[in-house]
């Protein structure tokens, strides 16, 4: 029990301050529970460690219900190697823990100016952990849990968190931040993972992101499934954000200069989600892309075997769509290039259009529709262009004799049920109420 404020300092040899014995002084505190009614300062050692005694867990500080406002603190001051451990057991931090360099906390050249290591089977952080340099938390066979409103902060260095599973409710902040879980990782809506100057990397087998992740560049990777909840926000201040998973579901917001979404299986953007590549490229790469949310970029790329959905993908300058299987926009999917080119490749064949709107079509249907439409001489250029636009979205062979039906869906006529039917030698325009006007077409283009 620490009942008074205590400072444990390395001894000093007054006659020879360079003594190897003194300069390499180490301190080990072994205990099951370190109760603090006052602060504890450990100063000047080469190595200082607080470790679990015997075959026990280690608890530092006492549980508090006052939001830890009056919690006591353990300080490692000018200690080269600061460590808290419980080999094969659990560490619970109820007190504040920090490392400092009281002579010059900004002097990173000082040997006694390194960070803090916390190692155990399970690590539970119920209060703030602060280092003027680096923090390394390791629970490779267990769980790392951080409490809401707590902060793990490396002021001038990096934070590394490694665990089998992770449940993050507080803030993790450093110049760079790496959070790795070999199994599952959950970041709660209250959580914040912040890389102030560099990369924020979050890696797991399965990941559920409910909070905020930010950095100059951000990478979120799941070897299996990745889910971002509606409460989540993933932002990159001026760089790249990449999400990679076997299967992904995006319900929150993503905002970066460039955004890349990679899935080898299914990628779903949930209605209400918002993905922005503010000044660069939005790239969506998936086997099956189900796009129900809103996505935008200066340039957009959608590469998938199959694509469907009811959402909107908007490019300011250019859009590229490469679908090797089926493109299904019948539920309302819009892929739009506002001011530039929209290049569509369906099953390896390229068609240039301005936008893709609701409908279903195969590449063969599109090419045949455009070929036949060129024969219709009594249509104006505007009408022909309108039909050509419909070609990638609502043109279908409906009979085996190469009859093509275009469901114009308010694009060509004021009646939603209107149709244009083109078969060999004839094009018919129907208002949907039974009336139809037909014109003959020949291969030579003459009526």
Where are the language model's segments positioned?
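Right-handed parallel beta-helix
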Residues: 6-7, 13, 18-30, 74-75, ...
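Extracellular/surface-exposed low-complexity segments
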Residues: 336-447
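Charge-rich, low-hydrophobicity low-complexity segments
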Residues: 43, 50, 61, 84, ...
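Extracellular beta-strand scaffolds
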Residues: 1-3, 8, 12-14, 33-42, ...
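Intrinsic low-complexity/disordered segments
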Residues: 21, 185, 226, 443-444
């Amino acid at each position: 029990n620490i009942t008074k404020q205590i400072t444990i300092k390395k001894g000093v040899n007054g006659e020879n301050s360079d003594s190897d014995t003194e300069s390499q002084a180490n301190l080990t505190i072994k205990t099951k529970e370190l109760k603090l009614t006052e602060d504890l300062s450990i100063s000047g050692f080469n190595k200082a460690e607080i470790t679990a005694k015997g075959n026990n867990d280690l608890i530092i500080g006492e549980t508090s219900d006052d939001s830890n406002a009056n919690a006591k603190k353990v300080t490692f001051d000018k200690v080269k190697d600061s460590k808290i451990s419980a080999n094969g057991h659990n560490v619970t931090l109820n007190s504040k823990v920090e490392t400092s360099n009281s002579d010059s906390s900004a002097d990173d050249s000082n040997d006694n100016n390194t960070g803090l290591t916390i190692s155990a089977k399970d690590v539970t952080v119920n209060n703030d952990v602060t280092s003027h340099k680096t923090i390394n938390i390791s629970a490779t066979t267990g769980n790392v849990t951080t409490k809401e409103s707590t902060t793990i902060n490396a002021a001038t260095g990096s934070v590394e968190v490694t665990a089998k599973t992770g449940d993050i409710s507080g803030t993790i902040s450093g110049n760079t931040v790496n959070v790795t879980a070999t199994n599952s990782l959950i970041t709660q809506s209250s959580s914040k993972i912040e890389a102030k100057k560099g990369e924020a990397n979050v890696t797991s087998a399965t990941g559920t992101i409910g909070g905020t992740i930010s950095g100059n560049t951000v990478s979120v990777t799941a070897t299996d499934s990745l889910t971002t909840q509606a409460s989540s926000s993933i932002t990159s201040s001026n760089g790249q954000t990449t999400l990679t998973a076997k299967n992904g579901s995006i319900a929150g917001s993503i905002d970066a200069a460039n955004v890349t979404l990679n899935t080898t299986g299914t990628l779903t953007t949930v209605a209400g989600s918002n993905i922005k590549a503010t000044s660069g490229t939005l790239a969506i790469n998936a086997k099956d892309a189900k796009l129900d949310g809103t996505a935008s970029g200066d340039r957009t790329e959608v590469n998938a075997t199959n694509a469907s959905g009811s959402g909107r993908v908007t490019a300011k300058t250019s859009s590229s769509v490469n679908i090797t299987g089926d493109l299904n926009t019948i539920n309302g999917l819009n892929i739009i290039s506002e001011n530039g080119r929209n290049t569509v490749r369906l099953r390896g064949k390229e068609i240039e259009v301005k936008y893709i709107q609701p409908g279903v079509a195969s590449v063969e249907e599109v090419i045949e529709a455009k070929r036949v439409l060129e024969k219709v001489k009594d249509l104006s250029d505007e009408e022909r262009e309108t039909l050509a636009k419909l070609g990638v979205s609502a043109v279908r062979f409906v009979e085996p004799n190469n009859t093509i039906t275009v469901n114009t869906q308010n694009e060509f006529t004021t009646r939603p049920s209107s149709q244009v039917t083109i078969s060999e030698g004839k094009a018919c325009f129907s208002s949907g109420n039974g009336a139809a006007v037909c014109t003959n077409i020949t291969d030579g283009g003459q009526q």
